[in-house]
Amino acid sequence: MSRLLVVDDEANIRLLYTEELSEEGYEVITAASITEATEKLQEGVFDLAVLDIKLKNESGIELLQQLVKERHDMPVILCSAFSCYKDDFSAWLADGYVVKSGDLTELKNEIARILAKKVQKVTQ
């Protein structure tokens, strides 16, 4: 079972992601802030992180930069309510980008794609 870290300041989004992604067979751990996410990262190993770009008084990009430095092997998907960032995610060294919506099909597909790619790297 893959462990996912979901970082979003909106409680309803964290709940939605937890419910939907748990149904897909993932273990989902959530955090509402960079501080909380950092604590969760110190407590365990994660296979992938899903980060909201705009957190309350913080930026998911800051956490992404921290993850790139400290956990360069952990894939990260950025999420935003705005599609304008879609062309920038690779420059930020993220592995994927998803526009937030009530339908999590795109997010689920992106998670599956990235985790399959990660497994493929390990088996080569």
Predicted segments, located by residue:
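The feature encodes the CheY-like receiver
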Residues: R14, K56
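Charged docking surfaces used in two-component/phosphorelay signaling
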Residues: L15-E23
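Acidic catalytic/metal-coordinating carboxylates
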Residues: S33, S59-E62
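Active-site residues of response regulator receiver
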Residues: D52
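Short amphipathic alpha-helix used as the core "switch/output" element in two-component signaling
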Residues: I61-H72
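Alpha4 helix (beta4-alpha4-beta5 surface) of REC/receiver domains from two-component response regulators
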Residues: E62, F82-K100, T105-N109
